[in-house]
């Protein structure tokens, strides 16, 4: 019974966290457009939490559910007040009639049926996307095992524990004092902390929010992007809705961005930001609205859009390149068409206003990310040069690749083929050039990076993404759902129109008289085949991949031994004492779960606090090194945590001041062979985990 309740309750709690602020702000602004509600609800919610995080920097205010609700209500009230006092001062927008020469009309009950069917498709996509995450996690409170999630979990726990969520408070290198601070984007930890407060704690909150953003939010954003493209085609509301439903089904089973980025390193913020990018793009290319400042006006929509952009930027600043480059390519190509120029002329003031709002709302994140820009751009590519043919074919076929499929055996060929057909449809119709151009742009970037990772435009564009192939490669998948939707819709309609070409045989008359309904029915058949042949198998494989980092991990960073050790330390450590540790094992979860202050929250230490990596290198030298001994005493270290079977991680160029030069890292040199050192005794041991008690009086008595 408890399991059944948590199975539903925790995702619902996370859903409320991601949906309520965004919906309230949009509704207060008079936004009733379902496309925008699907595209921007989660980004706007995170943007609102960014304001709440800033407010937590005011003495006496603590980040949590009450403050988040207060900021939501205040912001909604301001927006609603502007809309209310300016009501009646808006000019109606012109109504565009559907282009029936492009798509057959859907009217009356057939239109209603199409919209209901589209809703079913979207809900089915959401269900598939959530199922793969729940299946791979096993339960919502399963410990993450990947490397990057170490910092993410510390951030979520720190926010929950202290209520400090301002950008200048995150990431604290010393969780006991909160200082010094190394900037880390907080857009994902903020909703995860709130979700954990109303569900099962930091781990549950983090897992639920990750699953929701990389699953349903990506599905809804992809549906919104497809709907935005079809709206620009004047396809009519029925076909626009069906295109969104088709895109949702395709998005639900894609391996990238969410599944692979969280599997290959636990790159949660980048995965989340990229998963919200289609929704932001959908809003950007449909920006506009009524003239004036009344409900639903273009200027209030600009405010909403700006808050949403700021929210996604706070999740991972690299999304500026993801969205910015994509939408610039879209506008350049669309500006080459008469209709594109007409739309852009009406949009640019709104987009400019939204940009100003986004810049103001994310000013602190902009400053923080600027401080990290040089570090991000200096990383070396994580792949060697490869042949052009392999680079092109693997990305057209959507090969899995990465740690799960290093030899490129598996692929999501059905989705890749549909996307290629979609590109051919664009060429045949000579419309929707912008979306094909975005896909082609990122395909060219990815292929160039794969062939020339050290030079060229691919390497330059890849700088905000740490020159990581999986991060850059994931951009292609952002446009697969919309291209697939174009393919299935227009191919289904084309088949029916061809069937209705013969003039004499009465058997083909139905294809002419009921072209719209029959085309929609044929689309349903095509999508049913895709679900059975591709979507469900993709979901199963994605769940298997996720399980290798959660439910059935291939390697273990934290297990029951770590949990027992953390509980022991929590019961015995004194106030003000710290636990000496290496963050590469499960020791940081002593802080996440039991609030035990640990010395290291970053696996290789921090350049802002040199003692962190100096102890990782030389802690065991305290009997003979007065400097190390002084550091140990000044930090008031009471216990030492060692896991002799810590997992292997890539060290690369990541160690501060190059204190560690080997390509991989497991157990810190300073924590090896501790048995028998003066003042150090085994206090607890379980499996490969040992906790030593440190008698500081013995250290103080050692000769200098």
Identify the residue ranges that each predicted region occupies.
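Membrane-interface helix-loop junctions at the exits of transmembrane helices
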Residues: 48-51, 127-134, 162-165, 243-261, ...
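Extracytoplasmic
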Residues: 13-19, 526, 530-704
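Short hydrophobic alpha-helices at membrane interfaces in multi-pass membrane enzymes
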Residues: 287-310
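Membrane-interface helix-loop-helix junctions at transmembrane boundaries of multi-pass membrane enzymes
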Residues: 234-241, 295-296, 339-349, 421-455, ...
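Active-site lumenal/periplasmic loops and adjacent helix-entry segments of GT-C-fold
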Residues: 122-271, 275, 292, 544-556
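Periplasmic/ER-lumenal interhelical loops and adjacent helix-loop junctions
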Residues: 169, 182-184, 346-428
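Membrane-helix boundary/interfacial segments in multi-pass membrane proteins
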Residues: 59-66, 138-145, 199, 256-272, ...
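Membrane-embedded, hydrophobic transmembrane alpha-helices
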Residues: 1-110
């Amino acid at each position: 019974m408890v399991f059944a309740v948590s199975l539903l309750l925790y995702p619902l709690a996370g859903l409320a966290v991601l949906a309520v602020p965004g919906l309230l702000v949009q509704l207060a602004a008079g936004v009733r457009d379902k496309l925008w509600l699907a595209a921007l609800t989660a980004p706007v919610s995170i943007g609102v939490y960014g304001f709440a995080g800033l407010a937590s920097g005011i003495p006496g205010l603590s980040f949590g559910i009450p403050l988040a609700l207060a900021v939501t209500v205040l912001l909604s009230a301001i927006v609603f007040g502007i809309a209310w006092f300016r009501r009646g001062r808006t000019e109606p927008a012109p109504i565009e009639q559907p282009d029936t020469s492009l798509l057959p009309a859907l009217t009356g009950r057939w239109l209603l049926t199409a919209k209901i069917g589209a809703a079913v498709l979207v809900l089915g996509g959401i269900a598939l996307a959530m199922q793969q995450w729940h299946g791979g996690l096993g339960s919502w409170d399963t410990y993450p095992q990947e490397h990057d999630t170490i910092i993410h979990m510390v951030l979520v726990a720190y926010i929950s524990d202290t209520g400090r969520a301002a950008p200048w408070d995150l990431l604290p290198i010393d969780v006991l004092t909160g200082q010094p601070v190394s900037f880390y984007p907080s857009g994902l930890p903020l909703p995860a902390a709130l979700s954990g407060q109303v569900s099962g704690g930091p781990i549950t909150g983090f897992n639920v929010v990750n699953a929701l953003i990389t699953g349903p939010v990506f599905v809804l954003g992809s549906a919104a992007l497809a709907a935005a493209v079809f709206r620009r085609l004047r396809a009519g509301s029925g076909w626009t809705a069906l295109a969104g439903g088709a895109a949702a089904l395709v998005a639900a089973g894609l391996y990238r961005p969410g599944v692979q980025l969280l599997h290959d390193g636990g790159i949660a913020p980048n995965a989340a930001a990229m998963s919200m990018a289609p929704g932001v793009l959908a809003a950007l290319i449909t920006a506009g609205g009524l003239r004036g400042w009344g409900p639903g006006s273009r200027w209030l929509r600009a405010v909403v859009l700006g808050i949403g952009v700021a929210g996604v930027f706070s999740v991972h600043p690299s999304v500026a390149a993801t969205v910015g480059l994509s939408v610039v390519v879209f506008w350049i190509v669309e500006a080459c068409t008469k209709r594109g120029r007409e739309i852009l002329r009406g949009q640019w003031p709104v987009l400019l206003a939204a940009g100003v709002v986004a810049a103001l709302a994310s000013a602190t994140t902009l400053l923080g990310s600027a401080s990290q820009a040089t570090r991000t751009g200096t990383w070396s590519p994580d792949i060697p040069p490869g042949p052009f043919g392999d680079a092109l074919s693997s990305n057209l076929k959507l090969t899995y690749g990465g740690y799960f499929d290093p030899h490129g055996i598996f692929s999501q060929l059905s989705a890749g083929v549909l996307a290629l057909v979609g590109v051919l449809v664009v060429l045949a119709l000579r419309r929707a050039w912008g979306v094909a151009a975005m896909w082609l742009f990122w395909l060219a970037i990815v292929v160039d990076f794969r062939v020339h990772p050290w030079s060229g435009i691919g390497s330059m564009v890849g700088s905000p993404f740490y020159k990581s192939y999986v991060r850059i490669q994931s951009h292609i998948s952002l446009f697969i759902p919309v291209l697939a939707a174009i393919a299935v819709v227009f191919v289904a309609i084309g088949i029916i129109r061809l069937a209705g070409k013969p003039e004499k045989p009465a058997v083909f008359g139905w294809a002419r008289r009921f072209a719209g309904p029959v085309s929609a029915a044929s689309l349903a058949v095509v999508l049913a085949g895709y679900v059975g042949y591709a979507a469900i198998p993709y979901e199963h494989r994605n769940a298997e991949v996720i399980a290798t980092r959660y439910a059935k991990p291939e390697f273990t960073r934290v297990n029951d031994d770590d949990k027992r050790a953390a509980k022991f330390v929590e019961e015995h450590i004194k106030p003000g004492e710290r636990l000496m540790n290496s963050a590469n094992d499960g020791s940081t979860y002593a802080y996440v779960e039991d609030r035990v202050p640990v010395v290291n929250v970053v696996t290789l230490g921090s350049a802002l606090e040199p003692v962190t990596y100096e102890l990782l290198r030389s802690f065991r030298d305290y009997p003979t090194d007065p400097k190390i001994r002084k550091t140990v005493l000044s930090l008031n270290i009471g216990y030492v945590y060692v896991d002799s079977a810590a997992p292997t991680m890539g060290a690369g160029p990541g160690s501060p001041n190059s204190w560690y030069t080997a390509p991989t890292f497991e157990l810190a040199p300073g924590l090896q062979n501790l048995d028998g050192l003066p003042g150090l005794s085994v206090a607890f041991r379980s499996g490969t985990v040992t906790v030593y008690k440190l008698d500081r009086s013995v250290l103080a008595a050692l000769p200098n």
